[in-house]
Amino acid sequence: MSQQETHGFQTEVKQLLQLMIHSLYSNKEIFLRELVSNAADAADKLRYLALTDDALYEGDGELRVRVSTDKEKGTVTISDNGIGMTRDSVIEHLGTIAKSGTKEFFNNLSGEANKDSQLIGQFGVGFYSAFIVAKKVTVRTRAAGHPANEGVLWESEGEGSFNVETITKNSRGTEIVLHLRDEEKEFADDWRLRSIITKYSDHISVPVEMFEAGKDAQEGEDGETIAAVEGQWKPMNKATALWTRNKSDISDEEYQEFYKHISHDYTDALKWSHNRVEGKQEYTSLLYIPAKAPWDMWNRDHKHGLKLFVQRVFIMDEAEQFLPNYLRFVRGLLDSNDLPLNVSREILQDNQVTTAMRVGVTKRVLGMLEKLAKDEPGQYQSFWAEFGQVLKEGPAEDFANKERIAGLLRFASTHEGSAATTVSLEDYISRMKEGQDKIYYIVADSHEAAANSPHLELLRKKGIEVLLMSERIDEWLINHLTEFKGKKLHSVTRGDLELGELEDAADKEAKDKITEEAKGLVERMKAALGAKVSEVKVTTRLTDTPACVVAGEGEMSTQMIKLMQAAGQAVPESKPTFEINPNHPLVARLNDEADEQLFADWASLLLQQAQLSEKGSLADPSAFIKLMNQMLLANAK
C-alpha cells in the first residue's frame, strides 16, 4: 500500500536551495559532476557490502552509472544500480544536512559563485546542486536486498517541502530525474552531457554510460546491404582505477581531476606522489597535499584519513590508521594486496601490515614536503601558511621522525626583522656565531611582544639570532623539541642565559664586578619583596631595561601557564626570579634611596612593571595603578 507523506525541509536546506538556485548560475554544470560522483559512490558501497553478502547483487553484478536525456520532456536522468536507499534514509539524507557541517558550510560561503560551488561537494550537499538547473527533482530508489515493494519515490520543486511515497521498484539502486527549467534546456543535449562527463568523470572507476542510438539497415556505395546496428549503452569514461595505471600515462590534468573527485576540494592540489611498493608488503599509494586547509582541519571529532582499497575494491573512507594525526591534511588513497577483503577498522588498529604501510606512507609524505621545501621554497611557504600549525604537532606525536619534522618547521627570527615565518632550524644553524652551541628562542603572546621583549637586549647587542615564536602551539612544541642536529634549544626567558663561549673574559669580569657591587642592593630587594619572588639576582641579559622576571630552569614558562589556565587546568604555584640591571638609572637611583618604605614601593613597582612586560597582564592591575599614581605624585612635589 502506498504511503505518501509531505515533509518540510530543514531550515538550513531551504537556505542551501536558495543559494543553489540564485547564486551558482556561473558554474551550472557542476550538478552532473556531483550526481555522477554520488552514483559512483553508491556503486562502490554496494561492491564492498557484497563481499560478505553477494545476494545483494540480485543477479546483476555489473555496476554502472547511466545518464540519459529526453529533449521533448526536457529531462535529464542519472541512474545507478548501487546500494540504493530505504524510506528512512531518503528522508534523512534528502531533507536535512548533517548538523556538524551546517554552520561551517554557511560560514564558509564567500558570496562568489565560483568559490561557493567548490564547497558543495566538500560539505556533502552535492545532491541539492540538482536544483541549479531543475525546477523539479524526482528520485526513485530501492535499497539492495529489500523487496521490490519497498521502493521509495521522493519529489520536490525546491521550495519549502518534499513528498515521499512508497512505490514498487523492481531494480535496486537510485534514479534521479531532473525536470529542467526552460532556460536550462541545453543540458538535455546528449553532446553537452558527454563533454561534462569526460571533463569531470573520466577517472571514476565505475562506467558512466550514455545510450548510443542504433542505425537502420542501409545500402552501401557498391549496392551491398549494411546491417542494422542496435542501440546500446556505451561508457563515456575510461572506467579504470587511475592509480593502477602507469604514471607516465597519466597527465597532470587527470591527477588533478582525480584529486577533486576523492577530496571534494575543487581547487587544484599543491603536490602529489604516486607510488607502487613491492616486496614484503605490496601496495599502491596516491597521496595529495592540498593547496588550502579544509574547513574541518581543527575539528577533532571529524574523521580524517585516506580512502582504502583492497585489490582495487573500495573498503572504506577516512581510514585514519595509515597516517599520524599531524599529517591529517593529506588526501589520497591506498590500495593493498595484503589486507583481507573483509578488513574492518578494528582489524586495522592492530595489524602488522597496517603498521608497515603507515611507516611507509609517513616517510613518503615527509619526503614530498622535504623536496618541496628544497626545490620550490615559495610553494613550500604557501603550504606552511596553510598547514604549519598542524605540522608542529609532529615532534610530540612521532618520535621516530622528530628530526625530519623539525627540519620542515619554519619560524620568525630577529635575523629577518619581520613576522614572516620563513626561517628553518637549518638556516639558523648556518648563521650561528663561532662558539655558539645553542639555538635561542622566545615564546610570547604575539610577534610584537616577542620581538620587543627586554630578554633579547644582550643577544641583540652581540648579534645573536633569536627565533621568535608566538603561535598558541609553540610552547607545547618546544617542550617536545629540545634539540636539533646536536644543538640544544634554549629559552631566553627561562633560567640563566648561558652564552658559553660567546661570553669573553671582559664580559665575565664586568659581570662579576657588577654582581659584587650590587650585593647590598640585591639583599635589600629580597627583603622588600619577600614572598613575591623566589630570588633576586643581577641580570645577565638586560642592557636598556631596569628589570625583568625569569622562570626557573625546571619551572613552567609564562606561556605554558597561560595555556593551562585557558584550558581550565590547575597550575602549580610558582614565583619568578627577579633580575635587576644595576647599570640602569632607575635601579642606580633606587640603590641610593634611604627611606625603606619608599625603597619597597619602588621595588614593587619595578617588579610589577617587569611582570606586565612578560605576561601582558597583572593579577591586580588596580593596585599597580594606585602605586604608580602614588609614586608619580611623590615625585611631582
From Swiss-Prot:
It comes from the Bacteria. The keyword Nucleotide-binding applies. Residues 1-345 are annotated as: A. Keywords: ATP-binding, Chaperone, Cytoplasm, Nucleotide-binding, Stress response. GO terms for molecular function: ATP binding; ATP hydrolysis activity; ATP-dependent protein folding chaperone; unfolded protein binding. One of its GO terms (cellular component) is cytoplasm. InterPro entries: HATPase_C_sf, Heat_shock_protein_90_CS, HSP90_C, Hsp90_fam, Hsp90_N, Ribosomal_Su5_D2-typ_SF. It is found in: Cytoplasm. PROSITE patterns: HSP90. Its main location: cytoplasm. CDD domains: HATPase_Hsp90-like (cd16927). Residues 563-637 are annotated as: C. The keyword Ribonucleoprotein does not apply. Residues 346-562 are annotated as: B. Homodimer. Belongs to the heat shock protein 90 family. Molecular chaperone. Has ATPase activity. This is Chaperone protein HtpG. It comes from Shewanella denitrificans (strain OS217 / ATCC BAA-1090 / DSM 15013). The lineage of its organism: Bacteria, Pseudomonadati, Pseudomonadota, Gammaproteobacteria, Alteromonadales.
